[in-house]
Amino acid sequence: MRYLRPIPKRLLTDDMLVWPSDGEGGFDAVRMVRHVRFEREEQLCGDAHRSADGGHGRVFVDAVSSAGAFEIPAGSRVLVGDNPSMVVESCKRCCVIRGSVHHWELVVR
């Protein structure tokens, strides 16, 4: 598997605003990343009448198909679609065999 195709744009239906963490507790200037995918993770509470906050999940950013893509540092704040803003807990770089980045997976809360 020497080459892996980019994630098709038809699957990347969301746009995302990013306030990158500056590493000192603040944020750098806002950046737009178009064509990302947000997959929400629903969690159930012990109370059978309600569910937990739906603002958790994963964001997939393709290195080729996502316009403005970059490696988003943990601690950054993101706004995807009409969801509330979320904080990036981790950013996993997914590479092809030759070491180039195929996509990033962000865990957001």
What are these regions (language model features)?
Residues 1-30:
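Active-site-proximal polar cores
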Residues 21-109:
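Short, conserved turn/kink motifs that form compact alpha/beta structural patches or helix kinks used as
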